[in-house]
Amino acid sequence: MIDNLFVFDFDDTLAKTIAHIGVARILPQGDDDPLFPMWLKNNDLHHEFERRGSEGIFYYLPSEEFATYQKIAASDELGDTKDIFDFAETAGVDPETTQAHNGIVKILKQAESHPNSKVIIVTARGGDSMETPFGNIEATNREDIAEFLASIGAAIEGSSIFPVGSSDPQHKANVVKQYIERLNPENVYFYDDNELNLAAIHELCHEYQDVTNIFAIKVTNGKQSPAIPCD
């Protein structure tokens, strides 16, 4: 048993990164949805460029806008359309354009110094290789994130960095579940900018309410909001 498990997202939580995620909306017969650009505009989502692939036209959103897109799409009635994604720009972390969110990094460093505690990074980025609509590419996120954190004084080993390779919040929740069951922490502190990820972690309260205290903490522009405990 440990006292605390600290879980941090990377993009837009520990650091501001420059990466775009492509989204294409496809009709049941396989054609592009001609209304998708208007849907983006109506929801105040602004793509910075577009690219045509064999599966459709991809509209590329900055990572923080993609998090907003996820929340809107999850609650919208999309009918029989299907959204597909291009995460190629998230295959690695560029240290030249990545800026630390110093306030959250400070929390991470303090967490590292806590006795009988564990710190892990869980990111939606891909791990070793990634399938994209434009071909397979190698991913270096685990190594890149470890090197970036080391450069700012945070010694998180690669074995404590988990690129789950999916924007599905349940994938992050599954990593946290494994650590709860393995280490039986008294408290879990989960930091993320994405409300869907925070909601998925909060759902673990029902499963582990007699085992651990779970706190979901939203990060916005490098600032943390008050922790949301289990009900």
What are these regions (language model features)?
Residues 4-6, 172-201:
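Conserved Lys-Pro-Asp/Glu-containing loop-to-beta segment of HAD-superfamily phosphomonoesterases
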Residues 5-169:
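Alpha-helical substrate-recognition element adjacent to the catalytic core
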Residues 13-14, 126-129, 194-197, 222-224:
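Solvent-exposed loop/turn segments at secondary-structure junctions
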Residues 23-43, 201-223:
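A short alpha/beta connector and helix-capping loop motif
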Residues 105-113, 177, 181, 199, ...:
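Surface-exposed alpha-helical segments enriched in charged/polar residues
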Residues 117-120, 149-158, 181-189, 210-231:
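Compositionally biased low-complexity segments enriched in polar/charged residues
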Residues 166-174, 222-227:
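A short acidic, often aromatic-flanked loop/helix-cap motif at beta-alpha or helix-coil junctions
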